Curated annotation (Swiss-Prot):
Coiled coil: none annotated. The lineage of its organism: Bacteria, Pseudomonadati, Pseudomonadota, Gammaproteobacteria, Pseudomonadales. InterPro entries: NDK-like_dom, NDK-like_dom_sf, Nucleoside_diP_kinase, Nucleoside_diP_kinase_AS. Disulfide bonds: none annotated. Keywords: ATP-binding, Cytoplasm, Kinase, Magnesium, Metal-binding, Nucleotide metabolism, Nucleotide-binding, Phosphoprotein, Transferase. It is found in: Cytoplasm. This is Nucleoside diphosphate kinase. Major role in the synthesis of nucleoside triphosphates other than ATP. The ATP gamma phosphate is transferred to the NDP beta phosphate via a ping-pong mechanism, using a phosphorylated active-site intermediate. GO terms for cellular component: cytoplasm. Its EC number is 2.7.4.6. Belongs to the NDK family. Homotetramer. Its main location: cytoplasm.
């Protein structure tokens, strides 16, 4: 097993429900360390840039509108197999298909307002972390 870093967003729907602490507690109780974190209001340009890979898909406009509808929490998580572990904690993208006890099953409203985002690969994690954090903003604990 390897120590990895992964990127996480607590999305506007979860921030609005005031469950930031409940979600981060799940990360920490599963052995992930939060090594960078900030709350921010994404601009339209930031959201479009972050989700650029989806720009040709029909849901892109709605995704950007949702991600700019309120503040988000962007975080870097570190731990053994952090990418896979975070994805397991989040549950399926569609909360109706997410296993009981996962973040999305417990806190998400819909496939669009699904509480959290997590990197799906090492390459994505590196790209996503660099998009929001300078190297000097990420620490080791």
């Amino acid at each position: 097993m390897a120590v990895q870093r992964t990127f996480s967003i607590i999305k506007p729907d979860a921030v609005a429900k005031n469950v930031i602490g409940k979600i981060t507690t799940r990360f920490e109780e599963a052995g992930l360390k939060i090594v960078a974190s900030k709350i921010k209001q994404l601009s339209k340009a930031e959201a479009e840039g972050f989700y650029a890979e989806h720009s040709e898909r029909g849901f892109f406009g709605d995704l950007v509108a949702f991600m700019t509808s309120g503040p988000v929490v962007v975080q870097v998580l570190e731990g053994e197999n952090a990418i896979a572990l975070n994805r397991e904690l989040m549950g399926a993208t569609n909360p109706k298909e997410a296993a009981a006890g996962t973040i999305r099953a417990d806190f998400a409203e819909s496939i669009d307002a699904n509480a959290v985002h997590g990197s799906d690969s090492e390459a994505a994690a590196a790209r996503e972390i660099a998009y929001f954090f300078a190297a000097t903003e990420v620490t080791t604990r």
